[in-house]
Amino acid sequence: SASIPAPYRERGQMAYQTGKRIVDMVWEDLKPSDIMIREAFENAIVVNSAIGGSTNAPIHLNAIARHLGIELSNQDWQNIGYELPLLVNLQPAGEYLGEDFHKAGGVPAVISELLKNNLLPNPNVNTVNGLSISENCKEVIIKNPDVIKTVNYPIKNKAGFINLSGNLFESAIMKTCVITKNFQDQFLSNPNDLNAIEG
């Protein structure tokens, strides 16, 4: 898991296993383009939305997809990820630290919860270890429900990204899980308000 804190011994073990696997992939002729297919990017959108991931993710993943000849846009982030619940209570919007997230099960636990609720759109896509994402994560459990919530008791119901467009820009992404009630009331509720944000 990418959430392993740097000082942990597991981090070094993971780095070693990663290097070993890369060599095996060369011998197997398993290339990044075999793994990074449209369906894998759709899964990434879902997981990023459920963990309250960075607004940098759409920029970078869209660019990586485009480099591979896959069309992925900000509108895809809204279409695929907006309806997703926020499951991770992590700073800066939440209470807990990255180390707590790792101890609670990390990304594999979030994926497992999404799988149990049929929210991961493409559970059978292949991963770098030769197993599907479902095979890798389906048995992982949430070890701390204060840090990683269940779909039935999320932090927020609709927490993905929305794609904005208007006369100032063609496309901009907004992370809805960090929108507070106060911000929504002040800037997003009354279109006649002079301070309202209009898209």
PLM features: residue spans?
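Catalytic or ion-coupling anion/metal-binding cores of large enzyme and transporter domains
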Residues: 1-199
